[in-house]
Amino acid sequence: MDGSGPFSCPICLEPLREPVTLPCGHNFCLACLGALWPHRSAGGTGGSGGPARCPLCQEPFPDGLQLRKNHTLSELLQLRQGSVPGPMSAPASGSTRGATPEPSAPSAPPPAPEPSAPCAPEQWPAGEEPVRCDACPEGAALPAALSCLSCLASFCSAHLAPHERSPALRGHRLVPPLRRLEESLCPRHLRPLERYCRVERVCLCEACATQDHRGHELVPLEQERALQEVEQSKVLSAAEDRMDELGAGIAQSRRTVALIKSAAVAERERVSQMFAEATATLQSFQNEVMGFIEEGEATMLGRSQGDLRRQEEQRSRLSKARHNLGQVPEADSVSFLQELLALRLALEEGCGPGPGPPRELSFTKSSQVVKAVRDTLISACASQWEQLRGLGSNEDGLQKLGSEDVESQDPDSTSLLESEAPRDYFLKFAYIVDLDSDTADKFLQLFGTKGVKRVLCPINYPESPTRFTHCEQVLGEGALDRGTYYWEVEIIEGWVSVGVMAEGFSPQEPYDRGRLGRNAHSCCLQWNGRGFSVWFCGLEAPLPHAFSPTVGVCLEYADHALAFYAVRDGKLSLLRRLKASRPRRSGALASPTDPFQSRLDSHFSGLFNHRLKPAFFLESVDAHLQIGPLKKSCITVLKRR
């Protein structure tokens, strides 16, 4: 009767509508059962007033059994109708006899292991809601003991009895209770996931196995799980190690973010203060210039206006005397002589020439002075802006940033960096170094991202523009700037050099100029089998220290310094700290008689004009080193911070 598929009603032979799951596990339409059971009670099997029975297996059920909709099966039916065309979307007709039966019909189940007997209700953790039986009355459902992937329902121990007694139900696959049964079904075919493809590493149903994965290595899920459980501890350990590394990286990134934010806030405050001072200086200069103009204007204007008044008064007197002379009668000789004398006296008062215009106005030079200041300011701003962006030379540009500020902020830190100090102090600046395989020379064999060894046979690495071609060297990933960084290296065997190299240094340089410390773009600490020495710009400075298998490197970018330490028993002993000496007030350098220090004084600061990378040179044929040991101890410190 159920030849049309497990998602069809055995009564109407159409796709299930409001599916109901009986305690025996069979599914029917709610309307079909409602129409069938009154008829069977009246005259069907069991006789009038007899118990209702399953139309398929004739399992009797007590009177008053409440029929409840199977919501999980209903959701699966909606998913199947919306995504996969098939028999469910086609209307039932009389020709269904010739249709291909659904492969996953309960009447022809795929081979499966022997079903286990119904078990006691699952013991659920405290506070977690157990999966309820789908066949129990609503509101009184017991915890499910098993879930049936064929019936798409979960059953308690009592309602699992039909799966034990009925031969048609014994082939159903029973699994521990599942809260979402659809997750154990193929989303494409809505069949139980029973196989595992090792080629594509996915779980499959039988239909997927026969259609899309022919020729692949397929195994039962239980077999693959048993195999994977053996590898589980290794995977968990690797995940834990990776999480520890990420934790260290996160701590370091957080320190970097905090450093950037605090540095930006402090720099903004300093810049704002300096701009305010510069603005105040310009405002004061403007007031002085404007006052000078006003003072010059008042002085010269007062003198010119006084001359103007005197000339106007003299002209007025001459005009009056001339007029009076013209009014004298011809017969009045006395008046004539008096008025003529008055006119002559008026002429004698201002017989000299009047003051001419000034040859030069002194305050008119103010604009020239201000223009010179403006041009100088514009030029200085443009030049310093180029220096700030890194477009100009460092010698005539910006001053070294923050050297005095760093020392004044934490005087104890400098003393720790220049003497013996506990290792925990440096772990605050721990930097996780990963070797960059794209830079490794062909005679270097990498072990993950932490180990490297020189070999005799070349390794066929892929071509890379950053790969060293003439020197057995390798760089670390990432470029360093604007901070303090610390990492450690274990010298396992051979001649090894450890240091830093400028990011833009060409890896195709010849052997004599491309080696670490043999140019102005790198510096290093070398162990040559007999003792330690430091190299920079082609000069070597031997160090009187015994061999230490673990070497610490501390890059102080803000202070333009690089320090090397011997790590023993949780303490660090300074081997050498490379830094340019400060010039004395007379202009002489601190150590003019030391050629190596003189070379540092003249060229070492230029190394910090670039971003720097950790660098490693394996000089002898048996050289071998390992990055570390910044492991659990370092991670613990970083996590505490």
UniProtKB/Swiss-Prot annotation:
Domain B30.2/SPRY per the UniProt entry, residue ranges: 413-634
Pathway: Protein modification; protein ubiquitination
Enzyme class per UniProt: transferase
Record-listed Omega-N-methylarginine modification sites: R585
Phosphoserine found at: S393, S464, S591
Entry GO CC: cytosol; glutamatergic synapse; nucleus; postsynapse
Keyword Phosphoprotein applies: yes
Family: Belongs to the TRIM/RBCC family.
Protein name per UniProt: E3 ubiquitin-protein ligase TRIM47
Native species: Mus musculus
